[in-house]
C-alpha cells in the first residue's frame, strides 16, 4: 500500500512524520531518512493492529499536497 506522509522539521532538530489517513500514526527521527524509515515501520504496525482488531484498513484516495507561497502585506 502507498500512503501520503507529512514530514515536518522540528525547531530543535529532528523530524516528525504523520500519516493523514491513519489518525495517530506518528513517528520521528533525527534525520529525514531515519524519520521516513521509522514511519514505514509505524504504518506496518498500525495496519497489523487494525487487522487484528477486525477493522478495515483505509485506502488512500489519490491526493496531492501542494505548497503555495504567498506574500502577506
Pin down the residues of each PLM region.
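Short, surface-exposed helix/turn micro-motifs that flank interaction/cofactor sites
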Residues: 18, 36-37
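Short, charged, surface-exposed hinge/linker loops at domain edges
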Residues: 1-3, 37-73
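Flexible, active-site-adjacent loop/turn segments at secondary-structure boundaries
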Residues: 20, 24, 55-57
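Short aromatic-glycine-(Arg/Gly/Cys) micro-motifs in beta-strand/loop hairpins
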Residues: 7-22
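A short, exposed loop/beta-hairpin motif centered on an aromatic-Gly-Thr core
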Residues: 23-32
Amino acid at each position: 500500500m502507498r500512503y501520503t506522509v507529512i514530514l515536518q522539521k522540528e525547531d530543535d532538530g529532528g523530524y516528525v512524520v504523520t500519516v493523514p489517513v491513519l489518525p495517530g500514526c506518528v513517528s520521528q527521527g533525527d534525520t529525514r531518512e531515519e524519520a521516513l524509515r521509522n514511519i514505514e515501520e509505524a504504518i506496518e504496525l498500525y495496519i497489523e493492529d487494525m487487522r487484528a482488531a477486525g477493522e478495515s484498513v483505509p485506502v488512500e484516495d489519490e491526493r496531492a499536497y501542494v505548497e503555495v507561497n504567498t506574500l502577506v502585506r
